[in-house]
C-alpha cells in the first residue's frame, strides 16, 4: 500500500487535468501539480508511517528490549532510519516512473533530479517522524503532530500563495521550514534544463534538516518509558 498510494493519486490527478486547457508555451496543469505531489507526498506519508510505527514499537516494548543490549541509541535510530528510507526510496522510484514514463510528466530538467529530491523529501519525513515520535505517548498523539509539524509547511512553502507575496513575518517563518526549500528545488528542476545553484543549495538545506532531526531524535530517545 505504501508503494502504490502515491502512484494511484498521481494517476487520478492525470485524468482530473486531462481536459483542462493549457496555455501555449506554458507547463501543463498536470505537470505543475504532479511536481508538487512528488515533493510533498513522500514527506507526508513517511512522516506519518515513521512516527506511528516508532510509537507502536515503544508501546509494545520492542524498542526497550533492543536498548537493553549494548546497541547505542544513535545506531538504533540509524537502523530504523535506513529501513524507512529504503521504503521511501522505493515509493519515490515507483511514483517517478509512473509520472514520467507512463503519464508523460515533462520537466525542463532531468527526471533524475526530481527522483533525487523526492527521496530527500521522504528522508526528511523519516527524520521528522523519528523526532516527533519521541514526544508522543500514544499513536493518537503521534498523529496529532501532523497538523502541528506538516500543515504549516504545506501552507507556507509556496503551494497556495507564492512565498514572495507573503507578509514579512510569514516569509521569515517560511524561510525556517524545510518544505519551502524542497518545493523551490523542484520548481528549479521543472523550469531549468541544468541543475541550478539554487537547487543545489535547497537540496543541501533539506538534507541538513533531515540529519539534524535524526540527531535530535537520537538525543531524546529514552531507554525506559515513563
What are these model-derived regions, one by one?
Residues 113-136, 154-157, 208-216:
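Hydrophobic alpha-helical transmembrane segments of polytopic membrane proteins
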Residues 33-43, 115-125, 147-155:
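Small-residue-enriched core segments of transmembrane alpha-helices in multipass membrane transport
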Residues 14-23, 136-176, 180:
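Transmembrane helix segments
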Residues 92-112, 120, 124, 134-140, ...:
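Short helix-loop junctions at transmembrane helix boundaries
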Residues 1-64, 73-93, 103-114, 141-144, ...:
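Transmembrane helix-boundary elements of multi-pass transport/secretion proteins
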Residues 11, 15, 96-101, 130-131, ...:
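Alpha-helical transmembrane segments of multipass membrane proteins
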Amino acid at each position: 500500500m505504501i508503494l502504490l498510494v502515491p502512484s494511484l493519486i498521481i494517476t487520478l490527478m492525470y485524468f482530473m487535468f486531462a481536459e483542462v486547457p493549457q496555455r501555449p508555451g506554458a507547463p501543463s496543469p498536470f505537470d505543475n501539480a504532479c511536481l508538487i505531489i512528488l515533493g510533498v507526498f513522500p514527506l507526508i506519508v513517511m512522516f506519518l508511517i515513521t512516527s506511528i510505527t516508532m510509537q507502536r514499537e515503544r508501546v509494545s516494548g520492542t524498542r526497550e528490549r533492543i536498548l537493553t543490549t549494548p546497541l547505542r541509541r544513535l545506531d538504533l535510530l540509524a537502523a530504523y532510519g535506513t529501513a524507512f528510507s529504503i521504503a521511501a526510496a522505493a515509493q519515490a522510484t515507483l511514483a517517478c516512473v509512473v509520472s514520467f514514463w507512463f503519464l508523460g510528466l515533462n520537466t525542463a530538467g532531468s527526471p533524475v533530479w526530481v527522483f533525487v529530491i523526492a527521496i530527500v523529501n521522504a528522508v526528511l519525513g523519516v527524520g521528522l517522524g523519528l523526532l516527533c515520535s519521541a514526544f508522543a505517548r500514544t499513536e493518537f498523539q503521534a498523529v496529532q503532530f501532523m497538523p502541528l509539524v506538516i500543515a504549516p509547511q504545506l501552507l507556507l512553502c509556496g503551494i497556495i500563495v507564492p512565498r514572495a507575496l507573503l507578509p514579512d513575518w510569514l516569509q521569515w517563518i517560511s524561510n525556517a521550514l524545510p518544505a519551502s526549500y524542497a518545493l523551490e528545488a523542484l520548481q528549479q528542476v521543472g523550469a531549468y534544463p541544468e541543475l541550478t545553484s539554487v537547487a543545489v543549495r535547497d537540496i543541501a538545506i533539506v538534507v541538513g534538516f533531515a540529519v539534524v532531526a535524526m540527531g535530535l531524535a537520537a538525543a531524546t530517545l529514552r531507554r525506559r518509558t515513563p
